[in-house]
């Protein structure tokens, strides 16, 4: 239940964070996430935001990286979403990326008790379409056979 609370809190935080100023992603576990800049979040109890969350990612990413090459992208985007200077809001992965991650990791997510959480998370992410194409991103290694990309 703790992770459900944190994901909900994080979604609210991201909604109010601006990417007017980005900072480098310093969490080593996120080095394969497909981006290097994240939004500048406020400190948590006087500690840098990324320092607070790096330990959680250090646990979850190794658990899931063996089942999907998109594990880092999905998990890191929850805590340190992609940022681009001058862009109003952080970027999040498109729904197809999350759905592919869940499909590839369904067994591991089920055993960890996280399948429902990530299935719901994927449903909340934007589809790529003319209205939302600039609200989500695909990692460079994403190949979607249904779209040819």
For the regions a language model picked out, list residue spans one by one.
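Mature extracellular/luminal domains of secreted and GPI-anchored eukaryotic proteins, especially small
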Residues: 18-149
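A positional/structural detector of protein chain ends, strongest at the extreme C-terminus
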Residues: 1-3, 148-149
């Amino acid at each position: 239940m703790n992770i459900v609370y944190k994901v909900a809190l994080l979604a609210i935080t991201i909604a109010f964070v601006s990417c007017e100023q980005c900072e480098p992603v310093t969490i080593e576990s996120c080095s394969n996430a497909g981006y290097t800049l994240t939004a500048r979040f406020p400190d948590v109890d006087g500690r840098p935001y990324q320092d607070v969350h790096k330990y959680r990612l250090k646990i979850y990413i190794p658990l899931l990286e063996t089942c999907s090459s998109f594990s880092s992208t999905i998990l890191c985007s929850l805590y340190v979403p992609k940022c681009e200077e001058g862009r109003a809001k952080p970027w999040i992965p498109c729904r197809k990326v999350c759905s592919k991650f869940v499909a590839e990791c369904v067994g591991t997510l089920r055993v960890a008790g996280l399948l429902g959480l990530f299935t719901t998370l994927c449903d909340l992410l934007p589809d790529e379409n003319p209205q939302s194409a600039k609200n989500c991103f695909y990692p460079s290694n994403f190949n979607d056979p249904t779209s040819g990309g």
